[in-house]
């Protein structure tokens, strides 16, 4: 089995190095001169990791599908506008992809803690949510994919809009997110800070292993499915689900 990582930026290199360190066959490919990957260059891979740019995701997936690849991990954010069409292409070809705004294991825990906190804060009453996110100057999307996922998880319980997220783009910070639930006399804060990209690489490896462990339903799978299986295997018989979202 061989993995091809599309994108030779910091994230792509980190994922490639993590795969190499455990003895996996991997090739990291940067952006081709033509701007599009030739499917023939992807023919050796049984799994493709996309760590490129948002606008490249649909073409990258199409090229890999044409090459015969049927397993994907998409670690790129900011391509929500093409998510439906990418999902349709995956389903029509029998391919499966794990997609996440943030593949770090700690981020998976953080997202669940935030969702549980939002449910509790809404039940108690009197709290308003706030999000602050800080990334390196060069990060293109704003708010970050993780911030948008935080909004998606908080909003069913406590109303919050993307234009209310405080966004900082400065320095070389890999990723920092703070979520606050503020009331008249107190504030609850939950914070996640990525020190480097090794955490994202660890999550990518977990997603890769999950896809190869068993046949998966064609289409897009959230990283939560990977997390659920990891937790279930480690603590059988225990329920780790987040609270049910209120009816719309």
PLM region spans:
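C-terminal substrate-binding/catalytic lobe of Rossmann-fold NAD(P)-dependent oxidoreductases
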Residues: 2-6, 10-42, 55, 125-247
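Small/polar loops that bind or transfer phosphate-bearing groups
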Residues: 7, 49-52, 74-76, 101, ...
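Rossmann-like NAD(P)-binding element
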Residues: 41-58, 73-74
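Rossmann-fold NAD(P)-binding glycine/threonine-rich loop
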Residues: 55, 59-63, 75-100, 108-119
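Residue-level signal for alpha-helix termini/capping positions
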Residues: 65-66, 91, 122, 209
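Rossmann-fold dinucleotide-binding core
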Residues: 93-147
């Amino acid at each position: 089995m061989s993995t091809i990582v599309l994108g030779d930026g910091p994230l792509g290199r980190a994922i490639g190095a993590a795969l190499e360190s455990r003895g996996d066959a991997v090739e990291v490919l940067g952006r081709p001169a033509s701007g599009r990957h030739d499917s023939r260059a992807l023919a050796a891979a049984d799994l493709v990791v996309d760590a490129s740019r948002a606008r490249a995701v649909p073409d990258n997936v199409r090229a890999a599908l044409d090459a015969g690849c049927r397993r994907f991990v998409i670690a790129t954010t900011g391509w929500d506008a093409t998510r439906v069409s990418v999902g349709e292409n995956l389903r029509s070809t029998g391919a499966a992809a794990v997609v996440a705004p943030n593949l770090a294991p700690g981020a998976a825990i953080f997202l669940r803690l935030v969702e549980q906190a939002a449910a509790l804060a809404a039940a108690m009453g009197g709290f308003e949510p706030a999000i602050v996110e800080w990334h390196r100057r060069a990060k293109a999307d704003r708010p970050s994919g993780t911030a948008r996922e935080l909004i998606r998880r908080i909003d069913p319980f406590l109303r919050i809009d993307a234009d209310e997220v405080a966004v900082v783009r400065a320095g070389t910070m890999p990723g920092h997110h703070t979520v606050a639930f503020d009331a008249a006399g107190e504030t609850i804060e939950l914070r996640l800070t990525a020190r480097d990209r090794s955490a994202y690489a660890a999550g990518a490896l977990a997603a890769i292993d999950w896809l190869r462990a068993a046949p998966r339903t064609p289409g897009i799978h959230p990283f939560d499915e990977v997390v659920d299986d990891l937790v279930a295997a480690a603590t059988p018989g225990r329920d780790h689900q987040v609270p049910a979202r209120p009816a719309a």
